[in-house]
Amino acid sequence: MKQYLDLCQRIVNDGTWIENERTGKRCLTVINADLEYDVGNNQFPLVTTRKSFWKAAVAELLGYIRGYDNAEDFRKLGTKTWDANSNLNEAWLNNPYRKGEDDMGRVYGVQGRAWAKPDGGHIDQLKKIVDDLTNGIDDRGEILNFYNPGEFHMGCLRPCMYSHHFSLLGDTLYLNSTQRSCDVPLGLNFNMVQVYVFLAIMAQITGKKAGVAYHKLVNAHIYEDQLAPMRDIQLKREPLAGPTFHINPEIKSLEDLETWVTMDDFWVEGYECHEAIKYPFSV
């Protein structure tokens, strides 16, 4: 929690105003931030200075794992995070590759589970990683990559958190996640949860111990219409003790995650927080 608040304060104090062409808004911006989450000791990085809807973050991650490309499928899991980008993004609405309402195109999980090969067919990056780790293999390239410039025109949004690199030291699994762009007030609490949970889930289904998850942000920013509530409300609140995160121990394989797992298979214990803050979302 401290590292999150320190980053927010750093942006407020030292950030540079940058015009964002996509949203038409100014962003107070810093370059490079490194966060760490001790998954092995269940130090769950859930924000307490405002209410954080962790279930929606986990639901979105599960949708990526399943390779979903439709906002309706994400809603069924329990998150509306893709409603706006799939249906309110003017450039995407006019894109000939859009298949209709709720279609997201070839983004995130589609790339992770069905990266198109130039000679035809697809690569299931995630399955390869799970198979390797289950067999104790780390080829120094256990990388789940969502960033495919050759297909940016076929999706509603470029990936923000685009790379997840898993590493084994003995029987302990580590994760390095890289994020090119981060809406800190609105998105970072989601992203922190997802990095933590991704390592916890992958360790569980591959039979490994969870170690530390390392989360790198390149462009970390606060939009101009988010600055006042961050500076004048959230940063003036005292953080509370952190909760613990739990996963149903019956989840034992990638197939389990693909088929029967629901949000009821994840729960948080001891979460206390301040009141919610409604930050504006920029499409």
UniProtKB/Swiss-Prot annotation:
DUMP binds at residues 22, 180-183, 191, 221-223. One of its GO terms (biological process) is dTMP biosynthetic process. The active site is at residue 160. Its EC number is 2.1.1.45. Homodimer. Catalyzes the reductive methylation of 2'-deoxyuridine-5'-monophosphate (dUMP) to 2'-deoxythymidine-5'-monophosphate (dTMP) while utilizing 5,10-methylenetetrahydrofolate (mTHF) as the methyl donor and reductant in the reaction, yielding dihydrofolate (DHF) as a by-product. This enzymatic reaction provides an intracellular de novo source of dTMP, an essential precursor for DNA biosynthesis. This is Thymidylate synthase.
